[in-house]
Amino acid sequence: MGRYRVRVVTGAWLFSGSLNLVRLWLVGEHREAKLELQLRPARGKEEEFDFDVPEDLGPLQFVKLHKQHTVVDDAWFCNLITVQGPGTSAEAVFPCYRWVQGEGILSLPEGTARLAGDNALDVFQKYREKELKERQQTYCWATWKEGLPQTIAADCKDDLPPNMRFHEEKRLDFEWTLKAGVLEMGLKRVYTLLRSWNHLEDFDQIFWGQKSALAEKVHQCWQEDELFGYQFLNGANPMLLRRSTSLPSRLVLPSGMEELQAQLEKELKNGSLFEADFILLDGIPANVIRGEPQYLAAPLVMLRMDPGGKLLPMAIQIQPPNPSSPAPTLFLPSDPPLAWLLAKIWVRNSDFQLQELQFHLLNTHLVAEVIAVATMRCLPGLHPIFKLLVPHIRYTMEINTRSRTQLISDGGIFDQVVSTGGGGHVQLLTRAVAQLTYHSLCPPDDLANRGLLRIPSALYARDALQLWEVTARYVKGMVHLFYQSDDIVRGDPELQAWCREITEVGLCHAQDRGFPVSFQSRAQLCHFLTMCVFTCTAQHAAINQGQLDWYGWVPNAPCTMRMPPPTSKDDVTMETVMGSLPDVQKACLQMTITWHLGRLQPDMVPLGHHTEKYFSDPRTKAVLSQFQADLDNLEKEITARNEQLDLPYEYLKPSRIENSITI
């Protein structure tokens, strides 16, 4: 006879408990025992029970659960179950972290991470095969739009597997804050009904309510060239700027601009010439909103970096040259102030489109969804890489599904207020896929390719590289615990299937863009996993959080333009500027949505600080603890640096980086 102490831990969010009766069995190597237990699990509770079992069960392998119901299937969210056997102080941990519902019996394997083939007992191999077969029926791929990465097969959030859904607090916060934002938007529209809308200062009438301190700074300084240039390095979209290696072929310098050409060539020779080219937007059809045509441009911006690290614009060409049209107008800082301002506004509008669609939606959200679906389909719960990745896919499938049904859907937010809406956004995304390379998702490669290494004022670049290094050390520490050689990597069939699923299925044969179809070494695996974790955490934080700060003051980054780009500098008036910018309704909706999507989430889990105990090995706990310590040290370093800056760069402070893409 032996005594077993069983601890049952229930989730802490709303409706995690259950009124249904739960029964448990302990399954050991020799036999199993049904526990005389009638449990009705309560939300947020840890409940302990002692049981005397008459026969030796042997080493524990599984805990089996059965939730009985008569009339109502009251789902239960079980975090984990631990069992302390006779004669030992050690606990066997059985992670669950899922909803228990329906009539069937759920088996939870003992949580030690195991590779395929590591199992001395065939029972674990059969379990992981059965689990993957069931998961592949639950998590299916779908094509949202031809030519784009595959998505989870779900027409709406209610079609998602229950374990990928928002928990109740998250759902309520998401839906109620959106309603509060819409209410605020309505109040702003009423407030402006009988007031003029003829000058830039009139935007002050709606610049109240939900905004940040940095948004107020943008409001005050947005017309300054220095802040315009700063945004290419450290704003909402630090992903487009590159150091020039030659003068762009599309740059047309009219006669009489020899002095500008000499300046450009001098900066080029000194290595201080930079460019931001929005050519991806060329030819994308613009939206028509309520019968009113909107407009798009494909600007080219030439900038120089002064000795103090300030990035300053030298010239803006709003449209690329067209053989059937006159040479495009080149706008300069010396032009009439309103003409130069309008040229910069056109650039900011173009940056809004690429930031939201290419670098935010495609390069973080859709890539993370591919990683999430492939992980659920190919890696069983016992696999160490599943345990490593699963905290970083929390809520991603639901937020992406909501995006496809509310934001970028037919009649959604993009169609209502954004100049690439109405179908242009899909064309733009399809074009952007060609630029979605493996290297583009890895900051050491991407920043080197764009010539942005070792620039003191490039704060995104500096912080991204440090976070990449910290994440890479964490990943390497975990991988080397389970893969002692390259041969073990090559011989892991589940891992290799996961790699192929991402590259060939989810990313639609992306091997021609540098993504691997197999892993041949530990180093290659570590690099790929670092990319996965970084994309789902730090990169999304850098791209998402800036919306609240940089897009809240609408003239700094208008979602749409209502007049075509100017072709003459002398004809630009305040009427032209205001007629180009979004009207009150569109401006209010832009402020509402960017606040809703860019704010810090009240239930956020900071990077590396997830509480789920998927790993039970003490060695993995030591690796995670070191990761957390490294992040804390980086936090202190960034905080100390920011105290010396007029414009602190906060987006990659580890405490502000969410552990997964949840918004």
UniProtKB/Swiss-Prot annotation:
Residues the record lists as binding Fe cation: 360, 365, 540, 544, 663
Any Gene Ontology CC annotation: membrane
Cofactor(s) required, per the database record: Fe cation
Tissue: Found primarily in platelets and in microsomal and cytosolic fractions of the epidermis (at protein level).
Pfam families: Lipoxygenase, PLAT
Involved pathway(s): Lipid metabolism; hydroperoxy eicosatetraenoic acid biosynthesis
Catalytic reaction list: (5Z,8Z,11Z,14Z)-eicosatetraenoate + O2 = (12S)-hydroperoxy-(5Z,8Z,10E,14Z)-eicosatetraenoate; (9Z,12Z)-octadecadienoate + O2 = (13S)-hydroperoxy-(9Z,11E)-octadecadienoate; 2 leukotriene A4 + O2 + 2 H2O = 2 lipoxin A4; 2 leukotriene A4 + O2 + 2 H2O = 2 lipoxin B4
Gene Ontology annotations of biological process type: arachidonate metabolic process; cellular response to lipid; establishment of skin barrier; fatty acid oxidation; hepoxilin biosynthetic process; leukotriene A4 metabolic process; linoleic acid metabolic process; lipid metabolic process
InterPro entries, per the entry: LipOase, LipOase_C, LipOase_C_sf, LipOase_CS, LipOase_Fe_BS, LipOase_mml, PLAT/LH2_dom, PLAT/LH2_dom_sf
Documented effect of changing residue 663 to D/R/K/G: Loss of activity
Subcellular compartments: Cytoplasm, Cytosol; Membrane
Keywords: Cytoplasm, Dioxygenase, Fatty acid metabolism, Hydrolase, Iron, Lipid metabolism, Membrane, Metal-binding, Oxidoreductase, Phosphoprotein
Source organism superkingdom: Eukaryota
Consequence of gene disruption: Mice are fertile and appear to exhibit no gross abnormalities. However, they display increased aggregation of platelets in response to ADP. They also display a mild basal transepidermal water loss.
Cofactor binding, per record: Binds 1 Fe cation per subunit.
Domain Lipoxygenase: residue ranges: 115-663
Regulation: Activated by EGF. Arachidonic acid conversion is inhibited by (13S,14S)-epoxy-(4Z,7Z,9E,11E,16Z,19Z)-docosahexaenoate (13S,14S-epoxy-DHA). Arachidonate 12-lipoxygenase activity is decreased when PH decreases from 7.4 to 6.
Modified residues (Phosphoserine): 246
Function as written in the Swiss-Prot or TrEMBL entry: Catalyzes the regio and stereo-specific incorporation of molecular oxygen into free and esterified polyunsaturated fatty acids generating lipid hydroperoxides that can be further reduced to the corresponding hydroxy species. Mainly converts arachidonate ((5Z,8Z,11Z,14Z)-eicosatetraenoate) to the specific bioactive lipid (12S)-hydroperoxyeicosatetraenoate/(12S)-HPETE. Through the production of bioactive lipids like (12S)-HPETE it regulates different biological processes including platelet activation.
Similarity-based family: Belongs to the lipoxygenase family.
Name by which UniProt lists this protein: Polyunsaturated fatty acid lipoxygenase ALOX12
Organism name: Mus musculus (Mouse)
